[in-house]
Amino acid sequence: MALVIIGRTAGEDRDNVDAEGAYQLSKREIDMIEKVTSFFEKTAVLFNIGSIIDLSHPCLQACQAQMIVWQGGMVGGYGVADVLTGRVSPCGHLTDTIAKKIEDYPSSPYFGGEDKNFYVEDIYVGYRYFETVAKEEVLYPFGYGLSYTTFRDTCIDFPFVRISDARFRCR
């Protein structure tokens, strides 16, 4: 299996724009993905990004897996390696809705360049808009995830601890 890693710099005061190498894949990235998928039977693309990116480009359809790893910081690679090697299951759920194309986001015509905000979605911001108005425009819905799991909380008993005149019992 081949791994292709696509990265973007985005974050506070540095959002993506609808341009090649930002929201859109660059020509070099498209060329790289096409070459890798032509030489390898299986290809996975990892997106090290801080905001959404166009995941609908045809070159990505030839890839067997895509994973948004977001920006995990200097130790985020350890978690990605654990997922890739099967040590842990990628049981998280998507915290955003990813539309098929940027035009599907109602706020996209008003993004950037203005010194004011236009809240054209009214109360239907983010996933609420897509669940209410445009379900057919969703590529990956809010809450989407590869696997689901259950968690169990257990209580651990601790002995009494005397601190001054106070007594605490922890469970």
Q: Across the structure, where does each feature detected by a protein language model lie?
A:
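C-terminal non-catalytic regions of proteins with extracellular/luminal or membrane-system context
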Residues: 1-171
